[in-house]
């Protein structure tokens, strides 16, 4: 049976006691301490969901009321939605599961779904920095109501660039 690969040892995550190697990864910032409960929930889900038995765990982000998990593998939309639903019920908060490795636009489409992305532009500022502008139809603003800043911070964290979301 194949299992999802995690950056920390399974025993450390399940027990909550980190070995020196895992402790180093947490202290260096490679893995955030907030990711450990999310990894634990995913490991528990592997026993119930056969969809979750392959692939790699990349990263997760906890925004208080919502969790965003990035996985790498060959899952379809239905499987990702099923994983997200089960993870939501285990963690007691909303969860989104995204696939990594399909490009910036695809990652943003998954994150901002059901909002449609009209385009992504790069804006070079006079100080030499870059800003990505994500253009979304005005009619889809309702899907991001109250979450614009959260998604902007999330995308900025992943890409290492300043992000602006505009509605046209």
For the regions a language model picked out, list residue spans one by one.
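RNA-contacting regions in translation and RNA-metabolism proteins
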Residues: 1-143, 147-168
């Amino acid at each position: 049976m194949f299992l999802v690969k995690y950056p920390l040892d399974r025993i450390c995550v399940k027990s909550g006691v980190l070995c020196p190697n895992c402790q180093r990864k947490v202290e260096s910032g490679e893995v955030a301490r907030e990711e450990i409960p999310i990894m634990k929930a995913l490991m528990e889900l592997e026993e119930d969901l056969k969809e979750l038995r392959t692939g790699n765990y990349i990263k997760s982000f906890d925004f208080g009321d919502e969790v965003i998990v990035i996985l790498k593998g060959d899952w379809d939309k239905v499987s990702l939605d099923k994983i997200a639903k089960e993870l939501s019920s285990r963690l007691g908060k909303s969860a989104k599961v995204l696939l990594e490795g399909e490009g910036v636009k695809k990652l943003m489409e998954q994150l901002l779904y059901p909002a449609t992305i009209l385009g992504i532009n790069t804006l070079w500022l006079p100080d030499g920095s870059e800003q990505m502008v994500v253009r979304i139809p005005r009619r889809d603003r309702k899907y991001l109501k109250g979450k614009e800043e959260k998604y902007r911070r999330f995308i900025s964290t992943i890409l290492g660039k300043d992000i602006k979301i505009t509605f046209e």
